[in-house]
Amino acid sequence: MKVLHLSDLHMAPWQRKKQRFVRELADLEPDLVVDTGDNLGHRLGLLGLKAAFEPFRGVPGVHVWGSNDWWAPQPKNPFAYFGGPSGVPKQPERLDTEALRAYLDDLGWTDLNNRTARVTVCGVVIDAFGTDDPHREYDDLAALGPGLRGLRSRKVRPALTLGVTHAPYRRILDAFVDRGADLLLAGHTHGGQVCVPGYGALVTNCDIPREQVKGVSSWTHGGRTAALEVSAGLGTSIYAPVRFACRPEATLLTLTARSA
């Protein structure tokens, strides 16, 4: 099964090259798209996002929000990130999150913001759950309880349990492992965005270990271990459009059955 992980597009309507790149990812013929948020980078960003995502219409997908699906970016001092995870900006501009939700629903993608769902992809049953953005503390892990109990009461057992969030804070990853996730997907970090060759990321913008700021690794908690993939994402804030030694990325994961 091919899973396309998209994150942190921070889309603005004039970003035609990025829109074209995302459209062309449909040629990879993914079986499932996982969107881990921060889709919008401008109050008119949905226009560009529609241009990018339209080729995925009909492809199963799941999504969660990042803070930039709720609030427009603002100018800030980039050196402030060295003092720890970024805070809440003053008087941010509210984005049209409901229009974004309606569009992703129309594509056929399932909303996992503090929700659970069962999806079937290529005949494979997947139980999925997710949270709204932990960076803004919009996550509500308690809200997952009834849905998870309902999924586990079904006769058909899932082949895979997927945990999806925007920002990979330790408390969220721990909770996902506790709730039975086999695979964890997140974004938010931009892979550090500015990295030092031979050393890696300087900051993570959350509390995940620096060496797990991007890529595939594992996460262990309470005696269980799950696979973890953190995307470096495809975009940046329009007010800090710089990456160094950290290329933008979309990730195609190929999942195979465990050997008997």
Language-model region placement:
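Active-site-proximal beta-strand elements of phosphoester/diester hydrolases
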Residues: 1-10, 125-135, 162-166, 227-233
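Acidic/histidine-rich helix-loop elements
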Residues: 2-19, 40-43, 71-92, 137-140, ...
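Active-site neighborhood of phospho(di)ester-bond hydrolases with catalytic His/Asp-centered motifs
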Residues: 6-7, 32-38, 61-67, 112-115, ...
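Core catalytic region of metal-dependent phosphoesterases/phosphodiesterases
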Residues: 16-120
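Solvent-exposed loop/turn segments at secondary-structure junctions
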Residues: 39-42, 67-71, 119, 133-136, ...
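Conserved beta-sheet core of the metallophosphoesterase superfamily
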Residues: 62, 168-251
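Binuclear metal-dependent hydrolase catalytic cores centered on His/Asp/Glu-rich metal-binding motifs
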Residues: 76-109, 115, 121-165, 170-174, ...
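Short, well-ordered beta-strand micro-motif
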Residues: 118-120, 130, 216-218, 252-256
